[in-house]
Amino acid sequence: MSIISPQDVKRLREETNAGFGDCKKALSAASGDFELAKKKLREMGIASAEKRLDRDAKEGRVFSYSNNIHAGLLLVSCETDFVALNHNFVNLGNSLIKELVESGRSFPTASQELELKNLAATIKENIQVKKIFITEIQSNEFVKIYLHGEQSKIGVLVKLKVDDFSKTEDKMFQNFAMDLALHVAAFAPIYLGNDDVCPNYIKEQEEIFAKQLEFSGKSESILKGIVAGKIKKHLAEISLLEQSFVKNDKVTVREMLEEISKAISSKIEIVEFKYLRIG
């Protein structure tokens, strides 16, 4: 039987980031063979990672990447904010989103899932890909991405269509694109515009508001007006184009869009946006 020295365990630990006890166990099982011990650690880790899947993973971070063809956001969860700052966790997340964007895929491959399991085994936390958003970029479209804070707990992607694409170099346009991404991060709209809201959802909200006013004693015509007003206000809260702009609450996002379009002499449209948040 091979004698496993503390130096051997230390070396394996430095190379794999696995725990001291696990390294010692793996080296013993591998009779001191380092490569076999690494394989043992991966096997042990993947088995234990499966057991951790039912543990809460309420922390994590959002990763992003963009090229001239695609852009995307990736939300990877973990159990602690300490791990969310771990360089191995961050490096893997950045690598995954880059590979996804460059391939145009919106799902991880088997090898990428194995990488995640291996990392979960090393760090000993439940690590999972929760959300992936990949979008194609057309020749007249501009993408702005914003990640909030050191831990990137909020990620925003906004895609704009610009008639005269040369105007995307304009400082006013650049500032607006950044402000728009900040706006989405701050107000978390659900829909782009009122036309995108599901009719059944609006009907359900109308019924809720009507129920709240059921015993108000007001006439039916007045109640209809009140409900309509409440619906309008509610839609303005959840639809990006109807929200008050983050840098000027006297105008809506729609109005600001028209103002900037006029200022740079090129029509700007919001094609789509995505908001991802940890927790």
Swiss-Prot record:
Decide whether keyword Disulfide bond is in the record: no
Known SUPFAM superfamilies for this protein?
Answer: Elongation factor Ts (EF-Ts), dimerisation domain (SSF54713), UBA-like (SSF46934)
User: What residue ranges carry the coiled-coil annotation?
Assistant: none
Molecular function terms, GO-annotated: translation elongation factor activity
**Keywords, comma-separated and alphabetical:** Cytoplasm, Elongation factor, Protein biosynthesis
What does the UniProt entry say about where the protein is found? Cytoplasm
Please give the residue ranges the record annotates as the region Involved in Mg(2+) ion dislocation from EF-Tu: 80-83
Keyword Cytoplasm carried by entry: yes
Name a single GO cellular component.
Answer: cytoplasm
Give the InterPro entries listed for this entry: EF-Ts_dimer_sf, Transl_elong_EFTs/EF1B, Transl_elong_EFTs/EF1B_dimer, Transl_elong_Ts_CS, UBA-like_sf
Family to which the UniProt record says this protein belongs:
Belongs to the EF-Ts family.
Question: What does the function comment of this entry state?
Answer: Associates with the EF-Tu.GDP complex and induces the exchange of GDP to GTP. It remains bound to the aminoacyl-tRNA.EF-Tu.GTP complex up to the GTP hydrolysis stage on the ribosome.
**Name the UniProt record assigns to this protein:** Elongation factor Ts
Organism the protein comes from: Borrelia garinii subsp. bavariensis (strain ATCC BAA-2496 / DSM 23469 / PBi)
